[in-house]
Amino acid sequence: MKNEKRKSGIEPKVFFPPLIIVGILCWLTVRDLDAANIVINAVFSYVTNIWGWAFEWYMVVMLFGWFWLVFGPYAKKRLGDEPPEFSTASWIFMMFASCTSAAVLFWGSIEIYYYISTPPFALAPGSNGAKEIGLAYSLFHWGPLPWATYSFLSVAFAYFFFVRKMDVIRPSSTLVPLVGEKHAKGLFGTIVDNFYLVALIFAMGTSLGLATPLVTECMQYLFGIPHTLELDAIIITCWIVLNAICVACGLQKGVKIASDVRSYLSFLMLGWVFIVSGASFIMNYFTDSVGMLLMYLPRMLFYTDAIGKGGFPQGWTVFYWAWWVIYAIQMSIFLARISRGRTVRELCFGMVLGLTASTWILWTVLGSNTLLLMDKNILNIPQLIEQHGVARAIIETWAALPFSTATMWGFFILCFIATVTLINACSYTLAMSTCREVRDGEEPPLLVRIGWSVLVGVIGIVLLALGGLKPIQTAIIAGGCPLFFVNIMVTLSFIKDAKVHWKDK
C-alpha cells in the first residue's frame, strides 16, 4: 500500500521547479506592481520586435508541413489499428466544443474594435478600409493557418499514442527518437518538461484572467454588484472550491455534463446573435472579408512593419502566434486522443475544416455584431474601455441585443460554465503532468489537482491586478518562446521515428 501511494504521488523534478518559479514571479509582481508593469512592457517590446519574425516563419513552415502530411507518403497511414472511436459528426462537434472557452468569447467580441481603431498597413483609424480589413485579420489569426500548424503535433501525438503505444503525459516522452532515451529521461527531458509546465501554467492563468472579468461584469449588470478586484478574487476562489468539491465527491460526470451544456448553449447564443444582429450584413461582411483575406494573405503572413513601425504585427500577429504555440501541445494531445483510428489525411483535413468553421463562426458573428453597434452609434466602445475597462465594453455588446436581460443571463451562464470547465481541465492537465505513474483513465491525487487550481487562480488574480491587456499578452509571449523550440523538437522526433516505423512504400 505504501509503495502504491508513492508511485501515484508527485514527480518532484517536474512538480517543484514550476511551482517555485511561478510562485517567485507572482510574489515579485505583487510586491511592486508598477515595477512589474515596466518589466512587462520591456519584455513584450523585446520579444515582439527582435524575435517576432521567428514566430511568423514558424507558422509558414508548419503550414507547408500540413501539405506534406496531407499529400505526402504518410497521408493514408492509420493512427491505430482500431476503427475511428467517434463518428465524424461527433468528432467535429468535439472540436467545436474545444473552441468555446470564455477567453475565445472575450476576443471574439472585442478584437475587431482594436483592428479598426489601430489598423495595419498605415490605414486610417476607423476608415472603411480599416473596417474591411478588420474581420479579415480575425479570420487570418483564427483560421486555417494556425489550425494547419497544429496538424504536425496532433499527428505526432496520435502516432506516439496509437501506433507506438507510448504513454505520453509530458513532451519529453516523445523525444526519445530524437535525443535518445538517456537524454529524454534525464536532465534535458526534465528541462523541456519544466519549460512546458511553466508556460502552460501562465497560459491557463491568462485564460482565467480574461474570463473572470466577463463573469463579474455580468454580475454587475444583472445584480448590481460593483465590479472590483476583490470580487474577481472571490469569484475565482468560488470556482476553485467548486472544482475541489467536484473532484472530491466524484462529480466528474457533472463536469462532463456542464461541458456539453456549454457547447449547446454556445450554439444557441451564437444563433441568437446571428438572427437579431443582422444575418444579411453578417453574411455579406464575412464574404467580403474572405476576399480581403485571400487578397492580402501573402503580406499578412510576412508582415513585420519594419519600415513604418506601427506595431500592429507585434501587438497582434506575433502575440496570437505565441498564443497558438503555447497551447499547441495541450490542444494537440486532445485532438490526438479523439482521433484514434483515423488516417493522417483525415485528421489534418478534419482539423482545418472543422476547427476553422468553429472559430470563423464565432469571430464572424461576434465581430460583425460589434461593428454594427459601433457604426449605428449604439455603443461608444473607446469611452467604455477608458472609463470601465475592456470587459465592460464586451458585456455592453451583448446587453445591446434585444431581450437584453435574457441575453445577459445566457451569456453569464455560458461564461460561468466555461470557466468552471477551464479550471477543472487546468487542474487535471497539470496534475497528470506532474505526477508519476498516473495512467490514462486514472485520476491524479486530489490535493495535487486542488493545489494547481489554486496556483492558476492566483496567477489570474495577479494579472487582473496589473490591469489592461499588455500583462496578459506578455505572459503568453514569454511562455511561447521556450515552447517554440519544444514544439519543433516534438515534430522532428516524430519525423525521425516515422521514417523507421512507417517506411515509404
Swiss-Prot record:
Taxonomic path: Bacteria, Pseudomonadati, Pseudomonadota, Gammaproteobacteria, Enterobacterales
Coiled coil: none
Organism in which the protein naturally occurs: Citrobacter koseri (strain ATCC BAA-895 / CDC 4225-83 / SGSC4696)
Residues that span the membrane, as ranges: 10-30, 50-70, 92-112, 143-163, 195-215, 231-251, 263-283, 316-336, 347-367, 403-423, 446-466, 475-495
PROSITE patterns in the record: BCCT
Coarse class of the protein's main subcellular location: membrane
Cross-referenced HAMAP family: CaiT
PANTHER family named among the record's database cross-references: HIGH-AFFINITY CHOLINE TRANSPORT PROTEIN-RELATED (PTHR30047), L-CARNITINE_GAMMA-BUTYROBETAINE ANTIPORTER (PTHR30047:SF11)
Recorded GO MF terms: (R)-carnitine:4-(trimethylammonio)butanoate antiporter activity
Known partners and oligomeric status: Homotrimer.
Subcellular location: Cell inner membrane
Stated role: Catalyzes the exchange of L-carnitine for gamma-butyrobetaine.
Protein name: L-carnitine/gamma-butyrobetaine antiporter
Catalysed transformations (reactions): 4-(trimethylamino)butanoate(in) + (R)-carnitine(out) = 4-(trimethylamino)butanoate(out) + (R)-carnitine(in)
Family classification: Belongs to the BCCT transporter (TC 2.A.15) family. CaiT subfamily.
Membrane topology of the entry: Multi-pass membrane protein
Pathway of action: Amine and polyamine metabolism; carnitine metabolism
Any one GO CC term of the record: plasma membrane
Keyword Cell membrane: yes
Keywords from the named record: Antiport, Cell inner membrane, Cell membrane, Membrane, Transmembrane, Transmembrane helix, Transport
